[in-house]
Amino acid sequence: MRDALDRLEFLSDYREDNRIEAKRAQGGLPHSLWETYSAFANTLGGVILLGVAEGEDKSLYSVPLFDPQELADEFWSMVNDPKVVSVNLLRREDVQIVTSGRNQIVAIFVPRADFRHRPVYLGEDPFTGTYYRRGEGDCRCPRHEVEAMLRDRADPNPLAGLEPASR
C-alpha cells in the first residue's frame, strides 16, 4: 500500500475500494474519517486520503486544502484521545503530506489491528463504535462480531495446553 505514494500523481488511476478511502476534508477533519479508521483497523488496513474527491466516473482527484499540516496535527491530537478512538495504531511515518498534481494531500496509512487491539472502536462503547470495511463503505459491526473480537482479545489461544485426543 505504501508504494502507492510513489504513484499519487496518477491519482485518477485509483478508485475507492476496501483499502482506499477519499475524503475532501476542505472544512477540516470529517467525522466519517474515524469510522473509516475503525473499519480499516478491524478489517485489512488501508489508506485514507484527505484532500481527495471522487468524480462522477469514480476516479479520484485532489482538491486544495487550506492547511494540510494543520489537518495532520489535528488528526494526531484526536487519534491519541481515547474518547475519540480506542487505540492509536499509527507511527509518525503513517501520516504523510504528499503532492498530487498541484495540491497537497494528507495520506493516513491505517494498519490492520493486531487481535490484541481489536476491536478498534469510536467513543467509549465497542458495541456501538466498532466498524468494518465492506467494499468502499464502512459498516457498523454487529454485536456478535464485536463479542468475538473481545473474546479473541481476552483469550488469543483458546486451545493452548490441550493435549491431542488419544486414539
Which residue ranges define each predicted feature?
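Conserved N-terminal catalytic/coupling substructures associated with nucleotide/phosphate chemistry
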Residues: M1-R167
